[in-house]
Amino acid sequence: MAEQPMIEMKNVTKVYDNGTVGLKNINLKINKGEFVVIVGLSGAGKSTLLRAINRLHDISEGDILIAGESITKTKGKNLRLMRRKIGMIFQSFNLVKRSSVLRNVSAGRLAYYPTWKTTFNLFTDEDKQRAYEALQSVGMAEKVYSRADELSGGQQQRVAIARVLTQRPEIILADEPTASLDPKTSRQVMEDLKMLNEKFDMTVVANLHSIELAKEFGHRVIGVRAGEIVYDGKMEDTPQSVFGNIYNGGKGKEED
């Protein structure tokens, strides 16, 4: 019996209100525990694809399933429950700058509480312990009581990763997590994502602008151009020429 995909996109198309086609007939399956990197030019549709998975962008046609359940058709409380399974890491970190690192990381537990409780950021001792352990996992425990705006960009991104770990999702979507970071810090962030993938068996899908990091950390590479998937293959089987095709316009799609 075939393994049920953790993420499945069926004939997914996204057309924006101004008529721009963000995604065009995307068909994609990602299995539990994979580390998938998505590459392509700026504006190719990478972020749209990623953000469609957890409904930050609603799609125009098709369906998206998370562990076999349609997130496209889910609403209200059930959508909130489904989103618990999906952690998001942004290029801009999305931290509350004037709050402590501990409070920012504890926010990963907000999806587990009713709205009234999240409004007041009422975290339990268990939540705070989870947050501290997550900070230890990414080497940031010594900053637990620092304000987020006192940290470097790389440190803020690692705090964002700790927040996702505190959430304990099954899927991590990382949208250009290293875009504003120097090479050394970028590698540290990717090592953190690798740790979440290997230690906690979290499925990681990351948009990356660095081909070097994509080749080093990805199990599988998906090339996107003009809203379409033009390549999908195992990283170890992907020659350098494929990246040129993805960025320069040649076709390079690999069938299973």
UniProtKB/Swiss-Prot annotation:
Keywords: ATP-binding, Cell membrane, Membrane, Nucleotide-binding, Phosphonate transport, Translocase, Transport. ATP binds at residues 40-47. GO terms for cellular component: plasma membrane. The keyword Disulfide bond does not apply. It is a peripheral membrane protein. It is found in: Cell membrane. Disulfide bonds: none annotated. Its EC number is 7.3.2.2. Residues 7-251 form the ABC transporter domain. It comes from the Bacteria. PROSITE patterns: ABC_TRANSPORTER_1, ABC_TRANSPORTER_2, PHNC. InterPro entries: AAA+_ATPase, ABC_transporter-like_ATP-bd, ABC_transporter-like_CS, ABC_transpr_PhnC, MetN_ABC_transporter-like, P-loop_NTPase. It catalyses: phosphonate(out) + ATP + H2O = phosphonate(in) + ADP + phosphate + H(+). The complex is composed of two ATP-binding proteins (PhnC), two transmembrane proteins (PhnE) and a solute-binding protein (PhnD). Belongs to the ABC transporter superfamily. Phosphonates importer (TC 3.A.1.9.1) family. Part of the ABC transporter complex PhnCDE involved in phosphonates import. Responsible for energy coupling to the transport system. This is Phosphonates import ATP-binding protein PhnC. It comes from Lactobacillus delbrueckii subsp. bulgaricus (strain ATCC BAA-365 / Lb-18). The gene is phnC.
